[in-house]
């Protein structure tokens, strides 16, 4: 007898699956749908910028070189046609590479747009299958709804549960959210989605080793793609009839709670249900490609840049104090040698030094030709001390505030002091109206780095400027617009 038949599923799994199957995003939140539209284009634009990096592109393409799947899943900005598992990895890798996509900060951190790669790959795959069976493909409004659900699952689990404190990387939540939602997109039944989701929880999960000194490295650029591709794989296995594990969380000795969490179950103190909260409150990286806990510090530094210059720059500075949150201290307060771009974009002292010296921060500043050759950066880093501001940390976790504050105080050698503080970064919901035109420009600028023809770029711009047309476009037509091989094909 199969004992699994008699087992009751862990409630956490049932709640996720019931939300994925039953919640009507479009009917509940216009704001969430509009924000998802912004997030989709912002993430694809980040991917276009990622394609400029050979570190990223060397990891992309089919697993077996020079193979192509006719009618396969496409990868924006390229001519690849891949199986959906490979496509999810490719899209996830390019979207995440420059650390410029959106962000969610709570007890756990992460980037909910990492789920988009799994959603797009699964949606194009099932839509191609639907067409072959004279069924309708998924529409882009279906993609936006799927995004909202992935964001919500990842973000709500992150609110009160810290995976980083037990050494696990936040991409575990990408795998979990993407598995539930992509299995649903593929047409999975409730039991099939439960089966897939349980396998996502009991999978091996990456450590945070590659995000911290002395081992910070490029895996943090492809970790999300890896999680997304695994989610698609687990979903496809469930669709093929693979079994699940009802008490994968609560089982004595071998369950997730015992193995990873000292038998403590997940907490849902801030939000006990899933809706559209996370998408509505998502944090966009509007201007600066750097770890999000440092975004307001960059803004402060750029505000202080003219004073820094007028006072004489590096040699005029006695010391600099950055007041920040406890998570920022834990993640991006770094001293000593920074070995690569991945190390530098996660160093608060580095990004502030660059912003003070140059009055801006770009991805190019992380490369060796700037970071190593311009010795002013490391000399200024040595003058910076980071300390926790307890009120900043409290407001960071306060659900009514959710601030990500930083302040910078510069003490000059002549005794003069200048301080600037910013509580909410430009990508915060509190500054959404200020951010929207900048997000639009960020996406349009990303098109300049692509190989699209001018007519194709005009077509993409037209789609971006017409959300109503976008909503009723099929995923297949959408991917045609963004595919190099057929980017010029007009869409009726």
From Swiss-Prot:
Annotated Gene3D superfamilies: 2-methylcitrate dehydratase PrpD
GO biological process, one term: propionate metabolic process, methylcitrate cycle
Catalytic activity field: (2S,3S)-2-methylcitrate = 2-methyl-cis-aconitate + H2O
Enzyme Commission identifier(s): 4.2.1.79
GO molecular function terms listed in the Swiss-Prot or TrEMBL record: 2 iron, 2 sulfur cluster binding; 2-methylcitrate dehydratase activity
Keywords: Lyase
Domain of life where this protein originates: Eukaryota
UniProt pathway annotation: Organic acid metabolism; propanoate degradation
Family under the similarity heading: Belongs to the PrpD family.
Classification via PANTHER family: 2-METHYLCITRATE DEHYDRATASE-RELATED
Function, as annotated: Catalyzes the stereospecific dehydration of (2S,3S)-2-methylcitrate (2-MC) to yield the cis isomer of 2-methyl-aconitate.
Protein name as catalogued: Probable 2-methylcitrate dehydratase
Organism: Dictyostelium discoideum (Social amoeba)
